[in-house]
Amino acid sequence: MINLRKTHPLMKIINHSFIDLPAPSNISAWWNFGSLLGICLVIQILTGLFLAMHYTSDTMTAFSSVAHICRDVNYGWLIRNLHANGASMFFMCLFLHVGRGIYYGSYLYKETWNIGVILLLTVMATAFVGYVLPWGQMSFWGATVITNLLSAIPYIGTTLAEWIWGGFSVDKATLTRFFAFHFILPFIITALVIVHLLFLHETGSNNPSGINPDSDKIPFHPYYTIKDALGLMFLLLVLLSLALFSPDSLGDPDNFSPANPLNTPPHIKPEWYFLFAYAILRSIPNKLGGVLALLASILILLVIPFLHTANQRSMMFRPISQTLFWILTANLITLTWIGGQPVEQPFIIIGQLASILYFTLILILMPPAGMFENYMLEPKW
């Protein structure tokens, strides 16, 4: 009997994507994060669906509905903790996935990379609108500060901000539409993930050496399914440890207080995964300049493929580029730390220097480093 997975129209697609897919024989654990992101997305959609069954998107009842989920709904506390900390795991995997792409030159698959950047932006938008939903103090003021940035756009800014708000400030209309956005966006993300995989399977995976791996491929199953299963065990271990032992450690204490438009928290800040971009935003004294720098900090990923000057794809054998990459990593950690600090010296100047270094490394230092490495590899005799 002919194998059904190779003949059935639907099973054939799954077979070519996850079972008989030819994969490079040397891809390391850094290639696990794609599948882990897929698992994170499934966890977020499922836990989110169960939360949406009990949540009410009204300013009067949103906060108490979240409290009701945690107190009265069967395992509601667990579902909520998994959803909140699942977002942190999602972004941890995202940052590592993007970092892997930069280190090993995966960005040279331009279509896959561009869809990936769009995915990153969409996930960030989803996380932002989701953070507003519990209607705690930091939720409300975070929404107010970030949506208010739209008013920096010349001429149409104020109108645009009021259009997003559905009024003259963040209120009931804003919360209702943010809930609608938060519900629909994960399904848009799922569609984009399919397109991301479609483009990836057009070219095949990159590998640590950056050399064309066509001469040495192995089937995805069982080799990489078992390897991904190990990654999944680690992911679940960290997620469950967070959700069960310290579920509020990554959240903001201000969100234990219901939103109060008359009382501004002393230090407004987003969740930890946005702090690097928030630090760049704050490091520029001008409002419009800050907004442009914020956008540039993410959209700069789109220009990375055009700044690749090295003859080698991967940084595996390029020590100068490696050094710059790890300086960039340390710089991003510094920006994350600065984003969580109050706006006072010495944090202001550290944030400004780190922001300048971020753009300098990517735009000015990395391209010549690649060219210099090419020169060093040329025979000199």
Curated annotation (Swiss-Prot):
InterPro entries, sorted: Cyt_b/b6_C (IPR005798), Cyt_b/b6_C_sf (IPR036150), Cyt_b/b6_N (IPR005797), Cytb/b6-like_sf (IPR027387), Cytochrome_b (IPR030689), Cytochrome_b_C_euk/bac (IPR048260), Cytochrome_b_N_euk/bac (IPR048259), Di-haem_cyt_TM (IPR016174)
Biological process terms in GO annotation: mitochondrial electron transport, ubiquinol to cytochrome c
Details of cofactor binding: Binds 2 heme b groups non-covalently.
UniProt feature coiled coil, ranges: none
Intrachain S-S bonds: none
Transmembrane feature ranges: 33-53, 77-98, 113-133, 178-198, 226-246, 288-308, 320-340, 347-367
CDD domains: cytochrome_b_C (cd00290), Cytochrome_b_N (cd00284)
Role, per record: Component of the ubiquinol-cytochrome c reductase complex (complex III or cytochrome b-c1 complex) that is part of the mitochondrial respiratory chain. The b-c1 complex mediates electron transfer from ubiquinol to cytochrome c. Contributes to the generation of a proton gradient across the mitochondrial membrane that is then used for ATP synthesis.
Name of the molecule in the record: Cytochrome b
Gene source species: Sminthopsis granulipes
Native organism taxonomy: Eukaryota, Metazoa, Chordata, Craniata, Vertebrata
Gene responsible for this protein: MT-CYB
